[in-house]
Amino acid sequence: MLFAQLNEYMAEVGLDASEQQKKQLVDFVGMLNKWNKAFNLTSVRDPEQMLIRHIMDSLVVSPHLKGSRFIDVGTGPGLPGIPLAILNPDKEFVLLDSLGKRIRFQKQVQFELGINNISSIESRVEAYQPEELFDGVLSRAFASIQDMLQWCHHLPKSDGCFYALKGQLSEDEMANMPQGFRVTDTIELVVPKLDEQRHLLRVVKQD
């Protein structure tokens, strides 16, 4: 059932994946649903809604990623990082979260589903100092872009960028971009079966 729905949704937005990748995505929903009962990883309880609100909501970002090394800050149970890693095995994803139960879940997903291009790290973002900087800093966890840039400013390479996953856009937020940063793209995302606004903002540092 979920497999057929995933096929339909991915075709609707023009995304390609192998049968193995689709199986990993559906199995991820199964693990999230199972672990959620004990560990309260997401407020979404229904697997069909997880497929829409977590899997497809993450995957529609994929065509807009530039580079090969990414960090997902405040990833929770691995969103959007794990679906994006499954769809992009040639890219590397670091999943950062400060809560141990979320990291344990991610590591179990990595083990059970055989995902080799993710690293899960338990840390607060301000305390995390990567050995190598990132092409892209992703997050759907921050309430405002200002917060994201304040806490994550040390993570991208000089030519890297921030990818802020947002719902409805706030004019105030867009008008009050912190000094030294510039929005290069505002992309309206379409998620199948989701009648809510979704946007991706690409932000770069200015010299």
Curated annotation (Swiss-Prot):
Keywords: Cytoplasm, Methyltransferase, rRNA processing, S-adenosyl-L-methionine, Transferase
Coiled coil: none
InterPro entries, per the entry: rRNA_ssu_MeTfrase_G, SAM-dependent_MTases_sf
Keyword S-adenosyl-L-methionine carried by entry: yes
UniProt enzyme class: transferase
Catalytic activity: guanosine(527) in 16S rRNA + S-adenosyl-L-methionine = N(7)-methylguanosine(527) in 16S rRNA + S-adenosyl-L-homocysteine
Entry GO MF terms: rRNA (guanine-N7-)-methyltransferase activity
Residue positions binding S-adenosyl-L-methionine: G74, L79, V125, E126, R140
The keyword Methyltransferase appears for this protein: yes
EC assignment: 2.1.1.170
Signal peptide segment: none
GO cellular component: cytosol
Compartments, record wording: Cytoplasm
One Pfam family linked to the record: GidB
Domain of life: Bacteria
UniProt similarity note: Belongs to the methyltransferase superfamily. RNA methyltransferase RsmG family.
Task performed by this protein: Specifically methylates the N7 position of guanine in position 527 of 16S rRNA.
Alphabetized NCBIfam families for the sequence: rsmG_gidB
Protein name (record): Ribosomal RNA small subunit methyltransferase G
Source taxonomy: Bacteria, Pseudomonadati, Pseudomonadota, Gammaproteobacteria, Alteromonadales
